[in-house]
């Protein structure tokens, strides 16, 4: 009996996932660390376009921390981080908005459109899509905590066939307020929750969450995350990511994933292969997570 061509078999193997995610919303956090090469940018755009052709509804929330830091350094504006969150002064806020809304956002939307998508680049400030207040009472300057997301407006764009590409900038409550810099991981989480997305996927510059031996942790739940934060396994910039993942899966999002955005077509590998890649976050009490809980718990013992 003739064997099926491997390329054809790959497509056949992916059919259950095409069916599973058809019509579903997937929020993708496109981190600045995954935007490092033109080739990776092209592969990312191809992945997003393919998702739309398969009837999936992608929403892109992007970061740009590396580019922001680069420009702040050139302008000799001091910048610092606490627990993975940027402390944003008023001068920094102008740079943040210029880079995120004026540069990176439009570049991503243009690239997607070049590849045949119908992308629209927007800021969280537009029409008050994202509203925020000062984080920790102003301890982080113009870095904000989100108070609301206008999911209805985003869904209206999706219904019209657009791929929303969202810059994580938020409105304040005061007139002429310069706005708030929102951690892109947090923004992606809040948007995924507002849309009741099937998944939120974080593209990063690491293979996932690592243990102290540098090995990939494939699955995490809330209890694991708290334990690993306490013992220092999860630290620095990974804290907002894992906190966002846990927040999402406990507020209407089925699964969250941290994957390596440096891997070509990493989104497709996560969505359409049996093993996926990176670290997945689950609720152990969620019957829809597709995980053998007994096996998982035994592995954790």
UniProtKB/Swiss-Prot annotation:
Belongs to the acetylglutamate kinase family. ArgB subfamily. This is Acetylglutamate kinase. Catalyzes the ATP-dependent phosphorylation of N-acetyl-L-glutamate. GO terms for molecular function: acetylglutamate kinase activity; ATP binding. Substrate binds at residues 64-65, 86, 181. GO terms for biological process: arginine biosynthetic process via ornithine; L-arginine biosynthetic process. It catalyses: N-acetyl-L-glutamate + ATP = N-acetyl-L-glutamyl 5-phosphate + ADP. Its EC number is 2.7.2.8. HAMAP family: ArgB. NCBIfam families: argB. It is an enzyme of class 2 (transferase). Pathway: Amino-acid biosynthesis; L-arginine biosynthesis; N(2)-acetyl-L-ornithine from L-glutamate: step 2/4. Keywords: Amino-acid biosynthesis, Arginine biosynthesis, ATP-binding, Cytoplasm, Kinase, Nucleotide-binding, Transferase. It is found in: Cytoplasm. It comes from the Bacteria. The keyword ATP-binding applies. SUPFAM superfamilies: Carbamate kinase-like. GO terms for cellular component: cytoplasm. InterPro entries: AceGlu_kinase-like_sf, AcgluKinase_fam, ArgB, Asp/Glu/Uridylate_kinase, NAGK-C. Pfam families: AA_kinase (PF00696). The record marks 29, 241 as: Transition state stabilizer. The keyword Transferase applies. Gene3D superfamilies: Acetylglutamate kinase-like. Its main location: cytoplasm.
